[in-house]
């Protein structure tokens, strides 16, 4: 199986600073690529569950995610290795599965890498991914990364 585990703030919802809910708009390009992703999609955020729901609803992509893992529902925060193990267990991930983990913070990507996930750095400086051995891929946006995954380009 293939799974996508997505951070929320500054990864799916690019805002780089204070977020005002009124400014969040649906992103039809992102929605298209998320719908085309070849596996189940999950949110893993250090924000609260209510915040995640609010943002995903405003982006009109809430229904595309199977589950939200948030700090108030897991009682853990990234980059906790225990959190990554709990997510693996809850989803039912096996060693034969492929997990794409999308995040903007390098320390969170280390958590995913340490757990056997394929890491995707979403960041304006994504070209510098070579500086970090635990970052497999770097992109300016989730849409750009999913375009490659969904068109079967090897990442």
Functional labels for PLM-detected ranges:
Residues 27, 45-48, 105:
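Helix N-cap/beta->alpha junction signal
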Residues 7:
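Active-site residues of response regulator receiver
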């Amino acid at each position: 199986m293939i799974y996508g585990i997505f951070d929320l703030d500054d990864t799916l919802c690019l805002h780089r600073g204070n977020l005002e809910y009124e400014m969040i708009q649906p992103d039809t390009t992102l929605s298209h690529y998320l719908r085309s992703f070849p596996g189940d999609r999950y949110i893993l955020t250090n924000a609260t569950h209510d915040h995640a729901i609010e943002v995903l609803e405003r982006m009109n992509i809430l229904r595309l995610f199977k589950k939200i893992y948030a700090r108030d529902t897991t009682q853990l925060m990234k980059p906790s290795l225990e959190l990554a193990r709990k997510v693996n267990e809850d989803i039912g991930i096996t060693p034969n599965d492929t997990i794409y983990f999308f995040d903007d913070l390098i320390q969170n990507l280390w958590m995913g890498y340490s757990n056997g996930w394929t890491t995707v750095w979403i960041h304006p400086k994504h070209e510098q991914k070579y500086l970090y051995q635990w970052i497999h891929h770097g992109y300016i946006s989730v849409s750009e990364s999913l375009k490659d995954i969904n068109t079967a380009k090897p990442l």
